[in-house]
Amino acid sequence: MSKYRSLEVGHISRDGYYDYQTSRPMQCVIQGTRRILWPQTVFYDIAVTDDLHLLAQLGPEPNYRWMDYVRETLHFAKQYDVSRIVTLGSMFAECPHTRDLPIDVSVDGVQSDPDSEYNGPIGIPHIIDAMAIEEGFDTTSIWVSVPQYLGGNEPCPQATLELFQQLASVVGLYLKAQELEGKADQWRAHCDVMVRNNADLDGYVDQLEHDYDMKQHARAIASSGAPAVEQLVQEAEAYLRDLP
């Protein structure tokens, strides 16, 4: 946001949405004065160009009253005549850091890649997307997979970069990301060192690379549309799923 003109235009009251033992307030000192920062959701109007503004919603996932929270979110979207709601998210998956991180995109609730359909627990971005569709909004949902072997809650600049690039594609503009690209390079270099220093992890990543490359190759062949090739791809993917 710091690369563009942005203005805070509203927020969702924190009352009733958060468990403060889970989403704890933070203490900080600003110009010598101690302040407490409570978890809350803030909306920013970001001027990408004179003709394109993004309404960005930033805040921790609420612990309670998700439906009410989403209704307030959509109320802001209607107030600012939002034409498309884009939700972003990440999840841990079995993928190598040495390849492009897998991206899953759905438009108006329809998955672009049926093979990557997700079944399981969901978070507030999914609820926003689903309720926005019910309210008549156009929606795009973008999720990136992060290597699960990294673990922890450390930021993943590569995942952020790939989400950013997908967002740029949705809005149809080049968005500035030079600083983020540098952080992504540093992240990959750090992961390389970590893997090289652990023989078991090194072997695991080798297997993930092999599986990833096999799937990409199978998808490329499948694009030819030949029935025999389609069957071959299905058999290859079934084999990969059965690997330990």
Stretch-by-stretch model annotation:
Residues L150-P244:
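A conserved C-terminal secondary-structure "cap"
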Residues L52, P60-D108, I128:
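Internal, conserved structured core segments that host functional sites
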Residues Y44-D51, A77-K78, A132-E135:
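Solvent-exposed alpha-helices and their adjacent loops that cap or buttress functional pockets
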Residues E94-Y174:
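Catalytic cores of processing enzymes, dominated by hydrolases/peptidases
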Residues W66-L74, P125-H126, F164, V233, ...:
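Short, hydrophobic/amphipathic alpha-helical packing segments
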Residues E8-D15, R84-S90, E179:
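A generic structural motif
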Residues M1-E61:
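N-terminal short beta-loop-beta anion/metal-coordinating cradle
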Residues G10, L55-Q57, V86, D138-W143:
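Hydrophobic/aromatic beta-strand patches that form the interior of the parallel beta-sheet core
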